[in-house]
Amino acid sequence: MSRRKVCRFTIEGVKEIDYKDVNKLKAYINETGKIVPSRVTGTSAKYQRQLATAIKRARFLALLPYCDRHFN
């Protein structure tokens, strides 16, 4: 059996996910630029919603790409 995934944000005691922290957000985006689901990352529902909002804000401000074509 596999080990249960734990939410990193809960362990670290993060109150709110910052959209300007691009390096942390990149860990939750796959190669094609999609947001990785919580069942894969183990993120709790509360932080998954915050994460999605932060990623969308960062995309809007051009801190993160919308799709994989921008990685080249």
UniProtKB/Swiss-Prot annotation:
Keyword S-adenosyl-L-methionine in annotation: no
Name used for this protein in its record: Small ribosomal subunit protein bS18
Taxonomy, superkingdom: Bacteria
A family per Pfam: Ribosomal_S18
NCBIfam families named among the record's database cross-references: S18 (TIGR00165)
Subunit description: Part of the 30S ribosomal subunit. Forms a tight heterodimer with protein bS6.
Keywords for the protein's UniProt record, in alphabetical order: Ribonucleoprotein, Ribosomal protein, RNA-binding, rRNA-binding
InterPro entries, per database record: Ribosomal_bS18 (IPR001648), Ribosomal_bS18_CS (IPR018275), Ribosomal_bS18_sf (IPR036870)
SUPFAM superfamilies according to UniProt: Ribosomal protein S18
